[in-house]
Amino acid sequence: MAMNYLEAFPKELREYYKNLFGKEEANKIMKKLREPVEHYYIRVNTLKISREKLIGELKKEGLKPLRSPYLPEGLYFVREGPNFSDDFEPKLPVVVANKYAAESVYQGAMLYAPGVLKADKNIKEGDEVQIRDPKGLLVGIGIARMDYKEMTEATRGLAVEVTLPKFKLPSLSELKAFEKGYFYPQGLPSMVTARVLEPKEDDVIIDMAAAPGGKTTHIAQLLENKGEIIAIDKSKNRLRKMEENIKRLGVKNVKLVQMDARKLPDLGIKADKILLDAPCTALGVRPKLWEERTLKHIEATARYQRAFIWAAIKSLRRGGVLVYSTCTLSYEENEGNVKFMIRKGMKLEEQSIFIGSPGIGMNKVQRFYPHKHLTQGFFIAKLRKVKDI
């Protein structure tokens, strides 16, 4: 029997959420975290195509894109599902997928052999099977395309063709429109983040944790490929992936720098605008079949973030702007660190687009909640440097 949605969160995290949001809200948030986003967003790459033209292209592929009411470059698709209830018990042989593969199947992806942990020994190619995560949650039903032995031993190939996932999001990366760089799959709050930065072409702009490039390429698009954005990431592989995205999207005004962003002041640049999408506990990411992080992860990560924040503040000119964002729900990584910034000579500013909720005991910052905004859990703050410390 699979655990219910509350059991998917460590007890101390459940208590933490209850204290932070109140019991009723906390339960609603945790329930939604277990599901994929209801509205799956993509950003129209207006460097290459208009929103209306892309809608036409996608409709030709049998898709049903809808216009975002908030952003002229936003389109979204409505999630399908749930296709079966939590207590549905099909009488079928079982394939167990690892957490990552199970989360993908749960949203409509196929199951490939590397994602198979174990399987019933009587499974033959062509059999109908059920797919469960390692903790017993039913994520989908499909047809075995390998027998038991092959799917548990092979390092590549399709193990199960998924015919009935729990939920279904559109599969977009195979589309011609994707290859041509007409769009980038990106959540609504992430798009709002780049808009809140309000980039101008004569600004010195730094994106401090840039790869794989969603927000950087959005800023480039808002600048119509003018000016320059310095994009920093310490991972060579992630920067390689970012380079592919930049090329696909036709972005021309980004300079990639491989370095630890905590050492940003060593470059001696005084920026007008800095975007810091900080490394975080990712407590707001959906779907989460189960959560493993606890309070000690929250506390350690909030401390770790301060090294990036301090580097950003030192690298801003006086009067410069920092937009700070996370995909997490904790107070310490969000409002707690905004208080740290204020102590270090920063002042909170109004955001040009505000479609989330106010912060916890703090106005001008915006929070996105899974149960209220049908998005990931997300946080955005905009601050201006008013004094040097």
From Swiss-Prot:
Temperature dependence: Methyltransferase activity is much more higher at 65 degrees Celsius than at 55 and 37 degrees Celsius.
Coiled coil: none
Gene3D superfamilies in alphabetical order: PUA domain (2.30.130.10), Sun protein, domain 3 (3.30.70.1170), Vaccinia Virus protein VP39 (3.40.50.150)
Residues noted as binding S-adenosyl-L-methionine in the record, renumbered to the chain: A209, A210, A211, P212, G213, G214, K215, D233, R238, D260, D277, Y304
Biological processes per GO annotation: RNA methylation; tRNA modification
The reaction(s) this protein catalyses: cytidine(72) in tRNA + S-adenosyl-L-methionine = 5-methylcytidine(72) in tRNA + S-adenosyl-L-homocysteine + H(+); cytidine(72) in tRNA(Thr) + S-adenosyl-L-methionine = 5-methylcytidine(72) in tRNA(Thr) + S-adenosyl-L-homocysteine + H(+); cytidine(72) in tRNA(Cys) + S-adenosyl-L-methionine = 5-methylcytidine(72) in tRNA(Cys) + S-adenosyl-L-homocysteine + H(+)
Keywords, in A-Z order: Methyltransferase, RNA-binding, S-adenosyl-L-methionine, Transferase
EC number, UniProt record: 2.1.1.-
Keyword Cell membrane assigned: no
Active site per UniProt: C327
CDD domains in the record: AdoMet_MTases, PUA
PROSITE patterns: PUA, SAM_MT_RSMB_NOP
EC primary class: transferase
GO molecular function per UniProt: tRNA (cytidine-5-)-methyltransferase activity; tRNA binding
Its job: S-adenosyl-L-methionine-dependent methyltransferase that specifically methylates the C5 position of cytosine 72 in several tRNAs. This modification appears to slightly promote the thermal stability of P.horikoshii tRNAs, but does not affect their amino acid accepting activity. Four elements in the acceptor stems of tRNAs are essential for substrate recognition by this enzyme: the target site C72, the 3'-CCA terminus, U73 or G73, and the second base pair C2:G71.
Similarity annotation: Belongs to the class I-like SAM-binding methyltransferase superfamily. RsmB/NOP family.
Full protein name: tRNA (cytosine(72)-C(5))-methyltransferase
Source species: Pyrococcus horikoshii (strain ATCC 700860 / DSM 12428 / JCM 9974 / NBRC 100139 / OT-3)
Lineage of source species: Archaea, Methanobacteriati, Methanobacteriota, Thermococci, Thermococcales
